[in-house]
Amino acid sequence: MNAQSPDGAPQDERTAELAARLERVHQRIEDASRRAAREKPELIVVTKFHPAEDVRRLYSLGVREVGENRDQEASAKASELVDLEGLSWHFIGQLQSNKARSVVRYASAVHSVDRDSIATALSRAVLGERENGGRADLDVLLQVNLDPAAEEQTRRGGALPASLPALADHVAVLEGLRLRGLMAVAPLGADPRPAFEWLHRLSGELQAAHPEATLLSAGMSHDLEDAIACGATHLRIGTDVLGPRPPMG
């Protein structure tokens, strides 16, 4: 039988594996930040497809920011892990308006707002939750499409850059939301550096109109160094911390 830490996390080979992986990622972040002469960004560990037990293990290793792509999975994990004080859930996947009410029950931030209707739905959901308790404002990042020339079926979501000013203005006046910055994914199969440099310029333009929108969510396992060099404040790292997706069933 595996022993457990005081917070309920199993002390086993998997915990040791996660600790080693996490240490390697932290070292990459530290090295890249030093080379770029930038402050170390926050690490969001993307736990999609991995069990709640792994999130508990990560918590025991000091992780307090986790990211999820699918509401059904995230909601179940958040409910199971409600005892983990200070654990913050970031919703980073494509969001449908009819899922907004569920998402605001557990998420501290949504990184994937790319149209007015999603923002409006989130605002209404936050206000609805406030009727039942003390729901704080929801941090919102606008997802920008850095590959607008891509075929529709290959896009990873996001607002076109030209539409960002109007979307930002819309979010900024919605009650219950805090406009905090931008999120993007580098185009598939392309050098991420030019895309992240573009994202950094867009971030500067956004901050000129909305000074509080200082966050830049960019960089995953394969391109975190480029993201850091271009000013990322938050990294979304999954595979390099958790390993390959576990088998289904």
What annotation goes with each model-predicted range?
Residues 2-222, 228-230, 242-244:
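Conserved alpha/beta-domain cores
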Residues 232-249:
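Gly/Pro- and small hydrophobic-enriched strand-loop and loop-to-helix capping segments
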